[in-house]
Amino acid sequence: MIVVTGAAGFIGSNLVRGLNRRGIQDIIAVDDLTDGDKFRNLVDCSIADYLDKDEFRERVRGGNLPALRAVLHQGACSDTTERNGRYMLDNNYRVTLELFEYCQAERVPFLYASSAAVYGGSSVYVEDPANEHPLNVYGYSKLLFDQVLRTRMDSLTAQVVGLRYFNVYGPHEQHKGRMASVAFHNMNQFLAEGHVRLFAGWDGYEDGGQSRDFISVEDVVAVNLHFLDNPDQSGVFNCGTGRAQPFNDVAAAVVNTLRAERGEAALPLAELVKKGLLRYIPFPDDLKGRYQSYTQADVSRLRATGFSAPMRDVQTGVSEYVRYWRALK
């Protein structure tokens, strides 16, 4: 049996599908369906059981779980604007610690979601404490358990892997609201208004030139399954493409994919701007000095574990995502 926490969420539901594609259905899905609409993310999944997150936590504390093959822990509060540190540390740190201790006692592989938010204002995205300066309590809640793992690396009884997700986009993120990916928001904005708005240039970057390491959720699933297949590998690893691309690339991929749906030709960036399909708004004063204009994962440690699969660039991954979303309409 494999446990997937956050199973009705964005990455968790895609992991369940990834396991299903391998023929694995002995899955315990764990989540909080207070937001009942999230059930839609599990409708086409095959699972053995569903547990509410509070019941699951009690079962972990009581040792009342069946024999497990692995725990894929994706459940967390991922709202980077959440200010309630007490809630965040219990939900993101303490629950992770309890699961870790259970898995170590039972010798069960434990893969968990960390975050690139641990780097905060750093300009170097290498898994090293010198680069880790979270700017919010969300990032700190993730860093705190990464630090625990580092202190326990020499005494592990079973695999433990923390994956620092960068800017993930893809199917089944619609419930995340403002925390959904820029690709999701660009797509909905273009469909509603006929154009996409991006920040104008600032801090040495041209209009729409601020860049992120955007990674398709399909590649995130592939990385998780790689570690599931290699239980001898443990540690904290960046989970990005190793490629920074500007927001302009995301917007262009969204607009041109939707234009193709209408039988219209793809346009270069300059033409998209000229036709008013891509517009720039002044960079907000309240974000100046507090905004990451560039992120790019160093994936050397990830690649050193034997993960050799190519990762989608924005043009490929975002186009796939838009076509998937439109096929549902």
Curated annotation (Swiss-Prot):
Annotated positions binding NADP(+): 10-11, 31-32, 38, 53, 74-78, 91, 142, 168, 176
Reaction catalyzed: ADP-D-glycero-beta-D-manno-heptose = ADP-L-glycero-beta-D-manno-heptose
GO molecular function: ADP-glyceromanno-heptose 6-epimerase activity; NADP binding
EC number assigned by the record: 5.1.3.20
UniProt KW keywords: Carbohydrate metabolism, Isomerase, NADP
Cofactor: NADP(+)
BP-aspect Gene Ontology terms: ADP-L-glycero-beta-D-manno-heptose biosynthetic process; lipopolysaccharide core region biosynthetic process
Catalytic residue positions: 138 (proton acceptor), 176 (proton acceptor)
Highest taxon of the lineage: Bacteria
Pathway linked to the protein: Nucleotide-sugar biosynthesis; ADP-L-glycero-beta-D-manno-heptose biosynthesis; ADP-L-glycero-beta-D-manno-heptose from D-glycero-beta-D-manno-heptose 7-phosphate: step 4/4; Bacterial outer membrane biogenesis; LPS core biosynthesis
Enzyme class per UniProt: isomerase
Pfam families according to UniProt: Epimerase
Entry binding sites for substrate: 167, 178, 185, 199-202, 212, 291
Cofactor remark: Binds 1 NADP(+) per subunit.
CDD domains membership: ADP_GME_SDR_e
Subunit and partners: Homopentamer.
Similarity comment: family membership: Belongs to the NAD(P)-dependent epimerase/dehydratase family. HldD subfamily.
Comment block on domains: Contains a large N-terminal NADP-binding domain, and a smaller C-terminal substrate-binding domain.
Role this protein plays: Catalyzes the interconversion between ADP-D-glycero-beta-D-manno-heptose and ADP-L-glycero-beta-D-manno-heptose via an epimerization at carbon 6 of the heptose.
Protein name per its UniProtKB record: ADP-L-glycero-D-manno-heptose-6-epimerase
Organism, as annotated: Bordetella pertussis (strain Tohama I / ATCC BAA-589 / NCTC 13251)
